[in-house]
Amino acid sequence: MFMLYHGWKSSASRRVRLCLAEKGIKYESHIIDLARGEHHSPEYLARNPNGVIPLLILPDGRSLYESSTINEYLDETYPEPPLRPGDPYLRAEMRNWVRYVDERIGNLIVFNWKHGIAQVAAKLSDAELAERIRKIPSKERQEAWMRAARKPYTPEEEGEARRKLVLMLDKMEASLKDGDWLVGDRYSLADIGIVPFVKRIDEEIAPDEVTAGKHPRVFAWWQAVQARPAFAEARIRPFTEP
């Protein structure tokens, strides 16, 4: 059986849970406490040197990490229902969408981390913070922890992050003029990749933008996504829930 090391609120973890649910793949769940730094322990880093979640342990014991890599592997090995277009050009378009969304994760962190990690990080002494940061393999995440602990994002920075996320909705709106889904005529990994972002935009960051008035095609897409059985199974719940 697969083992998934993940977090309920982690955007990347949500992507993989959505893919697993769409495929009907059962797995053993292991929750990682990001605020406690469990993903930076020597044991975890031995499995995933990037020190991020999710981490998927295959039935044969091998490890996979990075959500887009995991999801493509799952679609390769469990091809039904297909979550990648059959046409090579459309598959390339799908990967472009996933890459585009990945590049905007920093804008989401501005809002997501203040709900948990920032509250823990702010209470650390300078020595404790230095020790915590020392264990983080990514310089980008080291800087994010330092910001969360000692220099919270300003209203201006939040405004800029919000603006960039709304631009993502604009791009979606334009793409959806050709059909119900982002790429081709089927729900794909492109849609799965962006679901965690739209969820957060809708519930807190810019809910007035995910409406029939502002982005009607995105609004219809979002209703269709939430109606899929896999959405409930993947537990994409409000961020403010424990």
Spans of model-derived segments:
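A late-sequence structural motif
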Residues: 228-229
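GST-like domain detector, emphasizing the conserved glutathione-binding G-site
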Residues: 1-137, 152
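GST-like fold's C-terminal all-alpha helical module
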Residues: 103-223
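Carbohydrate-binding/catalytic loop surfaces
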Residues: 239-242
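Short beta-strand(s) of the beta-wing in winged-helix/HTH DNA-binding folds
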Residues: 54-57, 182, 232
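Short, conserved loop/turn and helix-capping segments at secondary-structure boundaries
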Residues: 38, 87-91, 212-219, 225
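Acidic/polar loop patches that form or flank catalytic/metal-binding clefts of enzymes
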Residues: 83, 232-234
